[in-house]
Amino acid sequence: MAAGQPARSGIDFSAFRDSKLARELIDRICELVGDRTINLMEVCGTHTVSIGRYGFRSIMPAGLKLLSGPGCPVCVTANRDIDHAIALANIDGAIITTFGDMMRVPGSSTSLAAQKAAGRDIRIVYSPLDALDIAEQNPNRPVIFMGVGFETTTPTIAAAILEAEARGLLNFSVYCAHKTTPPALRAIANDPETAIDGFILPGHVATITGLAPFGFLVNEFDTPGVVTGFEPVDILQGICMLVQMVVEGGSAIGNAYRRGVNADGNPVARQLVEQVFKPCDTTWRGLGPIANSGLSIRPEFSRFDARARFDVPVEATVEPRGCRCGDVLRGAITPSSCPLFGRTCTPEHPVGPCMVSSEGSCPAYYRYRD
């Protein structure tokens, strides 16, 4: 595609990669920060990777810290959930289906990848609808989908459950480990150790939720947030808007991603989720138990709920010794401060989940380190 030519979506992305505009935003950020210390946190794995790829941490003023938060769904999945999925793989005849990132995440003593190598039937799928096809092709075998993700992926899981009901695929079920973003942000805003001055809010999540669910950051904590896109100018604009609010003493929920996010989000997708799921308490790696931060399958769809259908013994949870993934996820440290980072823990040989996922902060720091 020629430079400046609009993409198929009709959006000309060259403006969001304009080096002159990026330089102007960087200069403005440096001017605003001055000799202040400002802590901003991104809570989206795609932002984490983009910030690393574009080298933004190294060109920001010394007083501006860009911290990575709990934006990677694989990373925040508790060991107990991974152990439970592995236990389900031991059911006679079971087929476990999962997104690829979950395969190498270490549980207490093993991983889905190791169990696959040992002979368990564990398959990578690119959509939960692929798991439905597998269930249809194997009517006498239980097919369990490992459901992990935030608001962006949950509607597709809800749609898959409704489709399973319509197709009469009673051998299909979902192990639901889905989480919602705002309660985790509240936990971080309440944490005095992190002292976050502003949040770079996730553009993908906000396409579903809209802006309103983040309003508590302003109302309860007087902390600004800006929904941000993923191109260089998007991210710099979001940072600039946040820094300006911090410096001027204001707080609001801004939108620097108007081409992708509107104030109301996607009500149809939310209605689909509410039809199939209900809020529940769940445990986040690094943040611990958080009330109403998870989703469970409603009783009327319990026949598709792997937790309800299968009573399996799950091993006692053991966390990897020395791994500080939890501290990374809540922004208490950067990945390079973990004693295992780049030594015993690398993308090729991960000790903790933060080094496994393509959206994890640890591989992003490892790949784009100076």
Where in the sequence are the language-model features?
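Phosphate/pyrophosphate-binding betaalpha-module
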Residues: 146, 150-213
